[in-house]
Amino acid sequence: MAEPEGRSLDDFFAKRDKKKKKDKGGPVSAAGSRGATRPPDGAPSSFSSSASSMSGAGKGIKKEKSGKSENPDQLQEKEDDEWKEFEQKEVDYSGLRIQSLQISNEKDDDEYEKKEEQGADWEDIGGCGTDKSSGPWNKTAQAQAPISAVIEAPEPVHTGGVYRPPAARASVATRKPQGPPEIFSDTQFPSLQATAKHIESRRDKEMEKTFEVVKHKNRARDEAAKNQALRLQLDNQYAVLGEQ
């Protein structure tokens, strides 16, 4: 029973070496595994049981490795599903109205060719392939209402040799003739006496009751001088010195 299990292990390792081709020591490990799995002559049954357990473990490892190898393939498939190429749909533009644009471009090309044929004299003559009055740039000009021209009144021309500005001319026109000045009028000849007039109010009347209005400034000094003249000292002030 041990020999077929050892052969299955050998086949497993050989297939792994063929697939990966990375491990350089693959043949050496395969030979060691062969020597390890083959039981010697006259070996007990325990050795065969251990070999069978090893073969079962090898099968489990093979299944795990095969499952791991399947996972990257699934991941690659998912990535391929995510990166989908975008295909642009073809749109039919035959229903669009592009004929007018094409016709206008053809007209412009024809005009340009005519202009080149005629040469530089074509501009001097003033020729043009299209009618300027029918262009879109003249629509606003036609819509505008005619502006009425403002007629200014001519200014009166003075024959005199003195120049007068417009402000002086207007003032001269509105000025009225005046007679001689009135000497006795307060408006034309104001006096200082008019500003010096004192208007009595109620407060001034109350102040007159409490205070004495002094009209003469030198009256107090005259009274003091009279009193001093009456108080004369007739005694001899030096008599005290003679007694000593």
From Swiss-Prot:
Residues 39-56 have a biased composition (Low complexity). It is found in: Cytoplasm. Pfam families: CDV3. InterPro entries: CDV3. This is Protein CDV3 homolog. Residues 1-144, 156-207 are annotated as: Disordered. PANTHER family: PROTEIN CDV3 HOMOLOG. GO terms for cellular component: cytoplasm. Disulfide bonds: none annotated. Its main location: cytoplasm. Belongs to the CDV3 family. Residues 1-15, 61-77, 197-207 have a biased composition (Basic and acidic residues). Keywords: Acetylation, Cytoplasm. Residues 131-144, 185-194 have a biased composition (Polar residues). The modification N-acetylalanine is found at residue 2.
